[in-house]
């Protein structure tokens, strides 16, 4: 029974640690978990991303997360209109442990991007989602189901909870400031991109438990984030420092680091016929009460596609069970560039 409880605790730990919210380490490829205001905040009019993560591989039946997201901006090409809009859609699913406890969530976001000047925008966004949480009861084993000789699944488990799947509605909102510049007139001048913002998830504090009699609500999650892309003394090298601070109930997390981007081929700033080819790499760190993980990352971008690979190296006390094996993460993104050229100062602006 003790071993069973330990396995259940290990399965639930990554979920309970931050209130069932998913965690991707490639935050530049999973913006929907940071701020719904990121919908439409990119150089292009359409992008689609898929993410996959396998966490704590040394533990039996590790914690796996899958997601896909899509966002589309419209009304951007009208130079006389200071405001345009964007829609975002995300779907994610996570599965953990032998009992396959999992959460499936589908969300839709709507953002308004207000032009402050040629290069700066203020963004406000709302997000609504619908989720379902369940587990595979057939895989659960209880001490009362051992006959003294072997395990007998026909014996009652003696538990009052039915563990039936439950659903919930969720709301989030966010604001952000986005600066993006593409200087066509000076060839070697580095374009820059910066985002700062604040978001709040679980505004309605949805009921979140298998037992309907329990008053268990998901606490709001507050996120403050900032990132910027700076040029260097080398015209084809860029520096990208970034930081996210998350607070949810009594839990908090700081995720920060920096990436370096090497431009192997610059995208055309006027015609758009030549696509960007770049290699990006760096290291981030996740800190709670202690240093939790170190995350090396690498991205390869070519012809509107970007492939990302990272690995969470666990350095917290859990490393005794995980053998420093945190989680492998993969992402693939496609961005469709803007069809209009001269009216958009962010077209082919260098971004991460």
PLM regions with names:
Residues 61, 101-104, 136-143, 186-188, ...:
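Outer-membrane beta-barrel translocator domains and adjoining extracellular loop/strand segments
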